[in-house]
Amino acid sequence: MTYKLILLRHGHSEWNAKNLFTGWVDVDLNDQGREEAARGGELLVENNVLPDVLYTSLLKRAINTANIALDKADRGWIPVKRDWRLNERHYGALQGKDKAQTLAEYGEEQFMEWRRSYDTPPPPLDDDSEFSQAHDPRYADLGDALPRTECLKDVLIRLMPYWESDIKEDLKAGKTVLVTAHGNSLRALVKHLDGISDEAIAGLNIPTGIPLVYDLDENFKPLNPGGTYLDPEAAAESIKAVANQGKK
C-alpha cells in the first residue's frame, strides 16, 4: 500500500511583498499569490494528481490559495478540514516588523537564529499588540495553548498529534490528501517525513504556490525523499527568493 500526499504553500501574500514578518497575522494573497495559486491548480490537473480531501490552516492566505487551486482543478467539492495546528509559526514580537530593518537592528546572527534555528523563539508578543491574536474569536477555545511566540520545534510539537489523528487516517483510507499551509508548518511536516536533522532544517525553504508531492510507503516513509515538485524549475527560482528574504 502506498499513499499520496500533496503539500502546497500559500501563494505570495501582501506582507511577503512588503517583506514583513507575518506569522499568525491574517493577511491575504496579493495578485501574484492568486496567480501562483491558480497555476498550482493547473499543475495538479496537468500531472493528474487530484486531491480527495483538503486540509488548511485558519489563515485566509492558505484558505484562499486552496480555494483558487481547487477551482482550477475542478475539485472545489472535496471535503475541507481546517485547524489552527496548520497555522504558520507564530513569530512573536517580530510579527509586523520589516525583515530588512530587523536584520539591520539585531545583526545577521540574531536575525537568522530567530528566523531559522530549530529551537530558539523570538521574544513573545504582548496581548495588547495590534498584531496579537489573544482576542481573535477563531482561537477562543485554545486558552493557555494560544502561542505568543514559537520556534520551529513548537510548530512540530503542535502539528504532530494532528498528523497522527487526522491527516494520516485519511491517507490510510486511500485518499489523496492536499495540505495547503505555510512555510514553517510545511517545513515542520517535511522535517518529520524526511527525518531531517535539527541543524539541516535551517537550510530548507519551501516555495510559494508550487505543489510538492510525496509518495509514502506503508510506514509513511517517502518513496521519493524530499518529495517531487510539479514544476521543479519554478520551485528552484522561488526557493532562492525565499532564502533571500530580509536581505533587501
Swiss-Prot record:
InterPro entries: His_Pase_superF_clade-1 (IPR013078), His_PPase_superfam (IPR029033), Phosphogly_mut1 (IPR005952). The active site is at H10 (tele-phosphohistidine intermediate), E88 (proton donor/acceptor). It is an enzyme of class 5 (isomerase). Pfam families: His_Phos_1 (PF00300). Pathway: Carbohydrate degradation; glycolysis; pyruvate from D-glyceraldehyde 3-phosphate: step 3/5. It catalyses: (2R)-2-phosphoglycerate = (2R)-3-phosphoglycerate. Its EC number is 5.4.2.11. The keyword Isomerase applies. Keywords: Gluconeogenesis, Glycolysis, Isomerase. The record marks H182 as: Transition state stabilizer. The keyword Iron does not apply. Substrate binds at residues 9-16, 22-23, 61, 88-91, 99, 115-116, 183-184. GO terms for biological process: gluconeogenesis; glycolytic process. SMART domains: PGAM (SM00855). It comes from the Bacteria. GO terms for molecular function: phosphoglycerate mutase activity. Catalyzes the interconversion of 2-phosphoglycerate and 3-phosphoglycerate. Belongs to the phosphoglycerate mutase family. BPG-dependent PGAM subfamily. This is 2,3-bisphosphoglycerate-dependent phosphoglycerate mutase. It comes from Arthrobacter sp. (strain FB24).
